[in-house]
């Protein structure tokens, strides 16, 4: 069974999604509120996680462990650094760089996490 987790950092990023879903249950886990329900025939869990990678990771982990989501979508600007991306655009990455992780003084290229490929996820 497919269950999709939808995460947004700010209320404005998830409000319209919650308005379009049939909410069957609302649960508070830690600082986050999870709305469980359906969009069409698809089961969804929607939450505003707060800004930042740690908040997103906590929310995504909760969705995976507690709500057993099979897919996760991040809605919102997602920290875009590209001025050509507009509200409503859908962006699917094929490669990614951890842009704010800098360990060049230790001889690694920008974005490199030791033990991981530079851009392939």
Regions found by a protein language model. Give the residues of each.
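Phosphate/ribose-phosphate-bearing ligand recognition and processing surfaces
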Residues: 1-2, 86
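N-terminal short beta-loop-beta anion/metal-coordinating cradle
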Residues: 2-67
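Short glycine-/acidic-enriched loop or helix-start segments at secondary-structure transitions
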Residues: 15-17, 57, 82-84, 101-102
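Structural signature of FAD isoalloxazine-binding scaffolds in flavoprotein oxidoreductases
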Residues: 86, 91-93
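Acidic/polar active-site rim loop that often engages polyanionic ligands
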Residues: 101-117
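Conserved small/polar residues in nucleotide/adenosyl-binding loops
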Residues: 119-121
